[in-house]
Design a protein with these regions (language model features):
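Terminal catalytic/cofactor-binding subdomain
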Residues: 1-156, 162, 201, 301, ...
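Conserved phosphate-binding loops in nucleotide/dinucleotide-binding enzymes
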Residues: 99, 171-173, 177-180, 308-317
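Loop-rich catalytic cores of soluble enzymes, especially ATP-dependent carboxylate-amine ligases
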Residues: 123-153, 159-162, 169-298
Length: 462
């Protein structure tokens, strides 16, 4: 199948070369799609390990067989796999938090059962505590990404092949200013984001050793190519700042129909437009360039919160999903949390996230940092009544409350409870976190694990 690149196979609807002003207009038009917040989504990444011996690498044939079985499931979510074999489920945009929780839990139950039949388990940790990075997917995108990220050190391969996250996707917000305005939500995301890093830090190990970070995953992102992983600079309106950031970030690769993709060094997208070499970029190239940018908050029409480590256990993922949704989408909670985190801007300073003192403290110290602990206590305290106002089930609220009591109130994070890698098992990770939740996620009699997953829909966009 031909790639969607201009000039590769004749005429193409979007093959007209971009000019600079046209690219800026496109970016300003697609990055923040405003309106009252109504939809929510979640993207869950999981490490795949043997249930009994997670320290042993899963053989390729065994993994391929399990992947084939999972692909055959009638999932609602979009199913993809990351370069190191991590499994990712991307939910459909849901009309409410509970709809997102229900459909995602049903998909996960089916995936977990299918992997379990092969003696495998999805493990929720921000970084694989056992395995060294080893890429399984041999695709031009990942060949080019590996080559480009290798220029700044080994963190790129570790991120690609051994990391996993919970990514919460929320509407951009309203055009007008106020608690639900997109400008306020954009600013909130970059301050509250550090609190979420600290509260959900769950990756203290790498290759069998303690790293000194509660979130080793976040430390990896901070070590990568800064243009590709930093937030846009402050001081500009969000649309203008994002458009400039995209155009001034280096191009990871220039796709071609045959042979390896070109991996230029130091060529920004703006310079590519101006020089037109090795070929003029078109709309499809700009769209693809956007998929190679990994800031902690990525505007894709909606806001994609990318800073949260994967969480252990069958229900761990729903806590960051519920908390983030409540704090952004409930007007009362959003106002409270904005006042709570606004003073963190002074600690953050001028550098962009995640390379500023606030985010560094969050990744290294978790909630042992007094300022982040105080902010987290206020934020989680605001989330609980907001969840009730939003119609979250009692079981979901109880799960969030249990996490708050176990970690936030005590200035701890999940990383603080993990045993050394030699004592970790896929079973212990699952059993440990399941104590945070009740037997099901709904207030009614039905159990999510007994529900039949819905038929596939369109690809997830939230």
């Amino acid at each position: 199948m031909g790639l969607d690149i201009p000039g590769a196979t004749g005429s193409c609807p979007d093959a007209a070369p971009l000019d600079e002003s046209g690219a800026e207009d496109l970016l300003r038009g697609i990055c923040f799609k405003t309106g009252p917040p109504r939809t929510v989504g979640v993207e869950l990444e999981w490490l795949i390990h043997d249930r009994e011996r997670p320290d042993l690498r899963v053989g390729q044939e065994r993994l391929d067989s399990a992947v084939e079985a999972v692909r055959a499931l009638p999932l609602s979510a979009a199913l993809t796999f990351e370069p190191g074999g991590q499994l990712e489920l991307s939910s459909q945009p849901a009309g409410s938090l509970m709809e997102c929780v229900e459909t995602t839990a049903a998909d996960l139950a089916a995936v977990r059962a299918t992997l379990g039949a092969a003696g495998l388990a999805p493990v929720g940790l921000g970084v694989d505590p056992w395995q060294a990075p080893r890429r399984r997917l041999r695709e031009p995108r990942y060949e080019a990404m590996e080559a480009a990220l290798d220029r700044t050190g080994p963190a790129g391969r570790a991120m690609m092949c051994t990391s996993a996250s919970v990514q919460v996707c929320l509407d951009a917000g309203e055009e007008e200013p106020g608690p639900l305005g997109y400008g306020r939500r954009w600013q909130l995301a970059h301050l509250l984001g550090a609190v979420l890093v600290a509260a959900f830090a769950n990756s203290p190990f790498q290759q069998g050793r303690r790293t000194g970070w509660r979130s080793t995953r976040q430390s990896l992102w901070a070590d990568l190519d800064p243009g590709r992983t930093l937030a846009p600079g402050s001081g500009r309106p969000p649309r203008e700042a994002w458009a400039a950031h995209v155009l001034d970030t280096t191009v990871l690769c220039i796709r071609c129909e045959e042979g390896p993709w070109n991996v230029p060094e130091g060529l920004t997208f703006r310079e590519w437009i101006r020089t037109g070499s090795p070929r003029p970029p078109a709309r499809a190239d700009l769209d693809y360039h956007l998929t190679t940018l990994f800031p902690p908050v990525r505007p894709r029409g909606h806001l994609e919160l990318r800073m949260i480590d994967a969480q252990s256990g069958p229900d761990g993922w729903l806590v960051p999903l519920a908390v983030a949704t409540a704090l952004f989408d409930d007007p009362e909670a959003a106002e409270t949390v904005y006042r709570t985190v606004k003073p963190l801007a002074e600690t953050s300073g001028a550098p962009a996230a995640p390379r500023n003192p606030l985010w560094t403290a969050a990744a290294r110290e978790g909630l042992a940092d007094p300022e982040l602990r105080a902010a987290a206590i206020a934020c989680f305290g605001a989330a609980l009544p907001a969840l009730e106002r939003m119609g979250a089930s009692g079981a979901v609220r109880d799960t969030v409350a249990a996490f708050t009591d176990r970690y936030v109130a005590r200035g701890r994070c999940p990383a603080d409870d993990l045993p050394e890698p030699g004592d970790l098992t896929a079973r212990s990770l699952s059993a440990d976190q399941s104590r945070l939740s009740g037997p099901n996620l709904l207030s009614g009699p039905s159990r999510l694990s007994d529900r039949t997953p819905p038929r596939p829909g369109k690809a997830a966009s939230a």
